[in-house]
Amino acid sequence: MAQKIQKTNVCRLLDAAGVEYELIEYAVDEADLSATHVAQQLGEDVDAVFKTIVLEGDKIKHFVCVVPGACEVDLKKAARVSGNKSCKPIPQKELLPLTGYIRGGCCPIGMKKPFPTYIDETCLMHEKIYVSAGQRGMQLRLTPQSLIDYVPLTVSDLI
């Protein structure tokens, strides 16, 4: 009998809201937590695997950007859409206390506090996208619109 995948808190939130998703496990390589590695493990295009980046701005203290795995957030674009003049990624040591997530497991769903959250417009080119399920080794596969509606996300040009 196959072992049942243990659901994450993110999954429980989506279940409670009636959001359809697929939970997928993959082998974690602690030396390579990149979205490219995750995409290889999933056998998917890295452009469909989105990563969650937490930023701090000069006006809006903290906000979140969700971008395709092979891309970097354009900080000028991120600052503009978030109402900041400038922004930068938060230091890694601040990620867990601020969001409740660790690097490689950060998800735009279920953070400790709600932050303004933006997703790159390229998400709409995919029928389904992947985002972390809230812990390393687990990804959610869902429609971009489901994610946009649930969080909620603002669709923007971020790359």
Model-derived regions, located:
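Extended, low-hydrophobicity, polar/charged segments
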Residues: M1-I159
